[in-house]
Amino acid sequence: MSNHLEAKMGDIADTVLLPGDPLRAKYIAETFLENPVCYNTVRNAFGYTGTYKGKRISVQGTGMGIPSISIYTNELISEYGVKTLFRVGTSGGMSPDVHVRDVVLAQAASTDSSIIHNTFGGGIYYAAISDFGLLDTAYHVAQDLKISVRVGNVLAEDRFYNDEMDRQKLVDYGVIATEMESTALFMLAAKYHVRALSVLTISNHLMTGESTTPEEREKSFNDMIRVALDTAAKA
């Protein structure tokens, strides 16, 4: 048991999917995993362990934002020995090359958060990147599943409502989507020498105004989930 998880040692698999929405964790477990068992209900951050294609996999809700995912990632790795982590969640499209419902594989995560400064001090602008092996596997899994994916740099923002952001400049420099967690996930994976990747779905487009419904964001986006799970099964 850790500060925020009531699981016992052995309850959580070595490989974990991390949706921000706890209800998406429940949906993934009940829809895709065989014999899912709930190991956590603390703060309604539901966590489940089951099997997928013969591999033991857990799904843990993290909540939104860098502080929240940092708590769960730290505890999963340091207290429960998790070795491979996949963020699965929504993102906002920014590039004209991505569209609503597209799947994005985050190669790297830029940020406007102070987490890098607080970790490394002034003068160091750390590049938070995903694990190349997971990224490569996920890309080829998507090809095998005939699921179109976009690979690129995403922005992990501290604020969901951020009208001051110069998004066009970010697009000009190759940022394809925005979300709120991946920088922390990639940094912690690097710190603890484990593997991490973010597999995202474009739920809305910040430039065009396209959007999906709240129900879709909770209970669909199955292409993203299948890519993450099939990659996890091979990891």
Curated annotation (Swiss-Prot):
EC numbers on record: 2.4.2.1
GO BP of this protein: purine nucleoside catabolic process
Record flagged with keyword Transferase: yes
Positions that bind a purine D-ribonucleoside: 4, 179-181, 203-204
GO molecular function: purine-nucleoside phosphorylase activity
Site (Important for catalytic activity): 217
Keywords: Glycosyltransferase, Transferase
UniProt cross-references to InterPro entries, sorted A to Z: DeoD-type, Nucleoside_phosphorylase_CS, Nucleoside_phosphorylase_d, Nucleoside_phosphorylase_sf
Domain of life assignment: Bacteria
Family indicated by similarity: Belongs to the PNP/UDP phosphorylase family.
PANTHER family from the UniProt entry: FI09636P-RELATED, URIDINE PHOSPHORYLASE
Function as written in the Swiss-Prot or TrEMBL entry: Catalyzes the reversible phosphorolytic breakdown of the N-glycosidic bond in the beta-(deoxy)ribonucleoside molecules, with the formation of the corresponding free purine bases and pentose-1-phosphate.
Protein name: Purine nucleoside phosphorylase DeoD-type
Protein's gene: deoD
